[in-house]
Amino acid sequence: AIFTIMTKVGIYAILRVNGTVFDDAMAQSIFKNTLLLIGLITSIYGVIGAIGAERLRRFVGFMVLSSVGTLLIAIAMFNTQAWSAGLYYLVHSTLIAAAFYLFCGWITAQRGMFKDHLKVAPKIKNEKAAALTYFLIAMMIAGLPPFSGFLGKVFILQATAETAYQGWIIAIILIVSLLSILALTRVGFILFWRA
């Protein structure tokens, strides 16, 4: 859970340093070029890591990393609409990632010797409640409607209208969202369907 908070503190620090340390020309050069590329790569790397994760904790960590990439993309667009959308998404992703880590600890305790390994294991106690909780968290972290993650991503996508790389940003965010849904489905299938 501390990983979740510390990454978001880092994102907020990047946003705060932008206005106080750099002048506009230097900040635009750094943010629009370097930070956008880092955000796109981070988002893709996070979701690919989540797809290949073999432990539940690593899976959640990679999902957090992917959300950090989305936040970096919002900051790198260097406009107030994108920053507002990023701050909205920051609150959402922090709370959902913390809930996901708590869920991970609960599932790990329930699975006995299998712990958080993403392998088929015997059914756990309260499987229906656990499956429902996982389903809700998965929908929230993937940014599906009607949850706040969907609005955060929509706001970020709307903010791309003022950027030169609009097509790339929209394509990467949507592809990463789709791959996140696939990764979350894979983990849910292993934890609950095949048990």
Model-derived regions: residue spans:
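Alpha-helical transmembrane segments of multi-pass membrane proteins predominantly involved
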Residues: 1-195
